[in-house]
From Swiss-Prot:
It comes from the Bacteria. GO terms for molecular function: manganese ion binding; phosphoglycerate mutase activity. Substrate binds at residues 123, 153-154, 185, 191, 260-263, 333. Pfam families: iPGM_N, Metalloenzyme. The gene is gpmI. Pathway: Carbohydrate degradation; glycolysis; pyruvate from D-glyceraldehyde 3-phosphate: step 3/5. Mn(2+) 1 binds at residues 400, 404, 460. It catalyses: (2R)-2-phosphoglycerate = (2R)-3-phosphoglycerate. This is 2,3-bisphosphoglycerate-independent phosphoglycerate mutase. Belongs to the BPG-independent phosphoglycerate mutase family. Its cofactor is Mn(2+). The active site is at 62 (phosphoserine intermediate). Binds 2 manganese ions per subunit. It comes from Clostridium perfringens (strain 13 / Type A). Catalyzes the interconversion of 2-phosphoglycerate and 3-phosphoglycerate.
């Protein structure tokens, strides 16, 4: 007998905006989505701000979205947690941070603060860097150096200069700190083993090699002059009198203030991992602190904020009922449907199968907007025909990853490719008498231009996301309004005929 699978399809970066201008979601020809939208119950969910455990007004992101969906409750994000501790003062007694600074003071070595310089709040926040500078000042440190990774992706593409000026003003006001290097996140924050990029960022920080400039402002202005926006700033060493302001040396303390792990792992391994094989380099022996736990297998680092653990996430609970589940995505979003969806747990649940489809190797995804959506779909259809799975979690990366390029025509093509796949998947699920829920983790592709400047917009948005209930049982029924991402899991469990565990504080969205 065929199983009646319950599937959640996450259209990554597919938000809802009433504004049609620069809206790739509205501009795309998506007959399958429209057909399902018109026939089946649907509502909108909040995917940003307080509803997902972020500060008010803060745009959502993929990690936060998948954590909230998988947990079935609002998960207070590291961003909110750390900001709160800075305000309350407990940040300044954090054991790992204090220890790194005390060691630098005792050994008369340097303190290096590295991370993404913006207020994007996806990977880092400039306020956390300011908090570290204040702590360094309190500790009486003088040799404090910032290695700034330029953003231009979670914030406007050329906003980096403003963040450099803001940082320089803060350092002047606090009375400590100098910028030693700047690197675009394309180099310093790769997550696809493109070691030739990471090596350039490493060489700037550890060897003082790379582009040269006499100030960070000069470096970024030159980059703009060369038509390279923040994300793509070549790793640049700031010099004084022909010598690097600072480089990371043995015995120094290093604090990496990014709180999101996925794009922090590679450069961290390059600096500290004795088994590192990405490129030839001399291993540094430093006191290294990760703001959060980037990787359990990294044993040679301290962690300032260890993960909070969550029991009875959707995957764990479904597994405890003896049911089979599948997680499927291409490389760019594989960690999201596995690690993040499971509440930051790497280990698969019992009877949880995983299918990883390789993302295409292209410089930027506007060059291949369909990415690997067709391959993901083929694999998924094969798996559905095995009649093995009770629950399937699927992610299509395209609207987000192509949305990040700022190229609207490509984002439209990305959504059209996904719509084609969505149609095939929906037909197959309905053929199996299953249920398909369609949603997104946050917005992106529905706003491809910055309305204030008319320039391309590459960042996420705070827009709501769709939630569709596609099933023979759903016809003629309705969903509640006013929901959030944390309400998806309780809704899915209800459809699966399972009791919602008490840890899930989200609400079932089915109107009785």
């Amino acid at each position: 007998m065929s199983k009646k699978p319950v599937m959640l399809m996450i259209l990554d970066g597919f938000g809802i905006s009433p504004n049609k201008e620069g809206n790739a979601v509205a501009a795309a020809n998506k007959p399958n989505y429209d057909r399902l939208f018109n026939k089946y119950p649907h509502t909108e969910l909040q995917a940003s701000g307080l509803e997902v455990g972020l500060p008010e007004g803060q745009m959502g992101n993929s990690e936060v979205g998948h954590l909230n969906i998988g947990a079935g409750r609002i998960i207070y994000q590291e961003l909110t947690r750390i900001t709160k501790e800075i305000k309350e003062g407990t940040f300044f007694t954090n054991k790992a941070l204090v220890k790194a600074m005390d060691e630098a003071k005792e050994n008369n070595t340097s303190l290096h603060l590295m991370g993404l310089l913006s207020n994007g709040g996806v990977h880092s926040h400039i306020d956390h860097l300011k908090g570290l500078l204040e702590l360094a000042k309190k500790k009486g440190l003088q040799k404090v150096y910032v290695h700034a990774f330029m953003d231009g992706r979670d914030v406007a593409p050329s906003s980096g200069k403003d963040f450099i000026v803001e940082l320089e003003n803060a350092m002047k006001e606090i009375g400590v700190g100098e910028i030693a290097t700047i690197s675009g996140r394309y180099y310093a924050m790769d997550r696809d083993n493109r070691w030739e990029r990471v090596e350039l960022a490493y060489n700037a920080m550890a060897l003082g090699e790379g582009e040269k400039a006499s100030s960070a402002v000069e470096a970024i202005e030159k980059s703009y002059h060369d038509n390279k926006t923040d994300e793509f700033v070549l790793p640049t060493v700031i010099e004084e009198d022909g010598h690097p302001v600072a480089r990371i040396k043995d015995g120094d303390s290093v604090i990496f203030f990014n709180f999101r792990p996925d794009r922090a792992r590679e450069i961290t391994r390059a600096i500290v991992d004795p088994e590192f094989k990405g490129f030839e380099r001399k291993q540094l022996h430093v006191n290294f602190v990760c703001m959060t736990q980037y990787d359990k297998t990294l044993e040679c680092v301290d962690v300032a904020y260890r993960p909070e653990s969550y029991t009875n996430t959707l995957g764990e609970y479904v597994a405890s009922k003896g049911l089979n589940q599948l997680r499927i995505a291409e490389t760019e979003k594989y960690a999201h449907v596995t690690f993040f969806f499971n509440g930051g747990v790497e280990q698969p649940n019992t009877n949880e199968d995983r299918a990883l489809i390789a993302s295409p190797k292209v410089a930027t995804y506007d060059l291949k907007p369909e990415m690997s959506a067709y391959e993901v779909t083929d694999e998924l259809i094969n798996r559905l025909d095995q009649d093995k799975y009770d629950m399937i979690i699927l992610n299509f990366a395209n609207p987000d990853m192509v949305g990040h390029t700022g190229v609207q025509e490509a984002a439209v093509k990305a959504i059209e490719a996904v719509d084609e796949c969505l149609g095939k998947v929906a037909d197959k699920v309905l053929e199996k008498e299953g249920t398909l829920f369609i949603t997104a983790d946050h917005g992106n592709a529905e706003v491809m231009i910055d309305y204030s400047t008319g320039k391309p917009m590459t960042a996420h948005t705070s827009d709501p996301v769709p939630f569709l209930w596609v099933s023979k049982d759903a016809e003629g029924k309705s969903l509640k309004d006013g929901g959030k991402l944390a309400d998806i899991a309780p809704t899915m469990l209800t459809v699966m005929g399972l009791e919602v565990p008490s840890e899930m504080t989200g609400t079932c969205l089915l109107n009785k």
